[in-house]
């Protein structure tokens, strides 16, 4: 959250640190053409939800996170996944995928993964899950700009796609001048 917004909130990589949602404006990153990708002058608001391992409403953190995701229907979800404990975190990822919201995985702690001599095939993980996966380290800032660009592209794509079943007849868009 802090790396993405420039804020200085107390955050951690375990459930219970954040018990309520926090909001911040996401910093903007210029694209290769020098223009800010897809924000078109609009700020993006990032909502930090409590760290959870599932959407089951058994704890206050889970209730807050679940209610926000289901009721507020955010434009997109950035799912922060601990790369040092992938299996435990993918349970929540699968639940979030079932909600059919645009989502990107920020595979965090990749500096620790490398330090431990491990590797994660992010391209294969993205292919298997069907969503973008961006390796990051919130501690070092590695991958944060790429994450922001990927999130901007995801939101832009979600807003520009025609809804399923939406149909325009060419005759409907022309004024009748006869």
Model-derived regions: residue spans:
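Conserved nucleotide-binding/hydrolysis micro-motifs of P-loop NTPases
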Residues: 7, 16, 51-53, 83-87, ...
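Helical mechanochemical/support elements of P-loop NTPase systems and associated helical scaffolds
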Residues: 15-22, 45, 57, 61-64, ...
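Conserved C-terminal guanine-recognition region of P-loop GTPase G domains, centered on the G4
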Residues: 27, 36-40, 64-134
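Canonical P-loop GTPase G-domain recognition
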Residues: 111-165
């Amino acid at each position: 959250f802090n790396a993405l917004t420039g804020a200085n909130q107390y955050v951690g990589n375990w459930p219970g640190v954040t018990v309520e949602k926090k909001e911040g404006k996401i910093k903007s990153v210029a694209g290769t053409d020098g223009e800010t990708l897809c924000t078109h002058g609009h700020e993006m608001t990032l909502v930090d939800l409590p760290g959870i391992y599932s959407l089951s409403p058994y704890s206050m953190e889970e209730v807050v996170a679940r209610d926000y995701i289901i009721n507020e229907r955010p434009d997109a979800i950035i799912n922060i996944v601990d790369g040092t404990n992938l299996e435990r975190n993918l349970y929540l990822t699968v639940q979030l995928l079932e909600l059919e919201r645009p989502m990107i995985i920020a595979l965090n702690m990749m500096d620790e993964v490398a330090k431990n001599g491990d590797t994660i095939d992010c391209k294969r993980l993205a292919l298997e899950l069907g969503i973008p996966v961006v390796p990051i380290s919130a501690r070092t800032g590695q991958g944060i700009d790429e994450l922001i660009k990927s999130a901007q592209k995801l939101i832009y794509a979600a807003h520009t796609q025609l809804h399923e079943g939406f149909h325009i007849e060419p005759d409907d868009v022309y004024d009748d001048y006869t």
